[in-house]
Amino acid sequence: VAHASPWVAAAALFAIGLPLVPSQAQVQRLHDGLARTPPMGWNTWNKFGCNVSERLIKETADALVASGMRDAGYRYVVIDDCWQVYRDTAGVIVADPQRFPSGIRALADYVHAKGLLFGIYTDAGTNTCQGRPGTLQHEQQDARTYAAWGVDYVKEDWCNSRGLTAPDQYRKFHEALVATGRPIVLSICEWGSNRPWVWGPGTGHLWRTTGDIEDTWESMLRNLDLTAMHQAVAGPGGWNDPDMLEVGNGGMTDAEYRAHFALWAILAAPLMAGNDLRTMSDATREILTNREVIAVNQDSLGTQGWLAEQPAPGLQTWVKPLADGSRAVALLNRSGAEAELRADWTAIGVAPGRARVRDLWARADRGSFAGSYAVRVPSHAVVLVKITPAR
């Protein structure tokens, strides 16, 4: 949600073209059975901001099913800021009765009946980013309320938090959620401003690494670069979060949106759609439901990909190891002109010899290649391939 946050220093490695070599950090992530793969779903904020309602959520749940997104893996339907208006005399948080006349419990029941999961938003401070009541000093009460409503996912923001310590506040809310006995995913949203990659594992299931994404090529790449710096801490039970998807919101071309989606897949990032699912184009739906690309993101190995090579400014090879021994490789052209990019077996960790190459956006086998695979990539685009060593 909109805020002013201190920026983390941009990745100097990218500026000078050095690859990021992953390290094997010993990270204690949560082992509660939740978020064993990156969470997938939909959130109101990017498209609708404060314009949220019961009708929107029901129609979106319907669209998740009708579009094939639910069956492709999208499960969480999340209401972001502005659903809440005040606390009653007992301190219980109250949903806007005009926008949610049936109440949140009934809405969660509707979402659950569609085979989906239900999420909600709060803030660790006194008020949310849009001035609604925050959860400060009501952590246990709010956790109990959400559990009683049937909430499966909570995004917790960091506005109006002056004087608070992020690790302590998020840990307190995590413990309150655990105490309810209901399995609830906790999404930590403090924009990467308190080094959540250090304390987020073991506290939440995902943690934002950046400020809010905008629906532009430049913003998407900025969030990619900042998130790539923390590759070692991500894995089953805890994920770096470069923010929600902008696919389908109109600020980028379809080729740029394919790159956005492919790179979030390589990053093992949460895939939270942020567009209007009721009116999306066929091209948008095809991006969001490409099961071969989703499979890269949801791979059971749970390794976040990294920048393997940058042979020239703006030309990058990103790689993600997969559980079956293959590699997903994104050949990314950030430059202003079409260029040839090459996936070199040595750089991406594939044994010398022949390997099969499949183009995941084209859904086409490209053949068997020895040592490397080269392809021309348009400006502001990606070619995403799966490279499988010959057995």
What are these model-derived regions, one by one?
Residues 264-267, 272-274, 310-350, 380:
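Carbohydrate-binding surface patches
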Residues 8-19:
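Bacterial N-terminal signal peptides
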Residues 138-141, 178, 182-276:
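Glycan-recognition surfaces
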Residues 60, 64-163:
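Aromatic-lined carbohydrate-binding/catalytic grooves of carbohydrate-active enzymes
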Residues 259-308:
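Catalytic cores of secreted or luminal carbohydrate-active enzymes
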Residues 368-391:
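C-terminal beta-strand-rich structural cap/linker in extracellular carbohydrate-active enzymes
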Residues 26-58, 63:
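N-terminal module-boundary/linker segments of secreted carbohydrate-active enzymes
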Residues 38-44, 73-80, 117-122, 152-157, ...:
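Structural recognition of the beta-strand scaffold that forms the well-ordered cores
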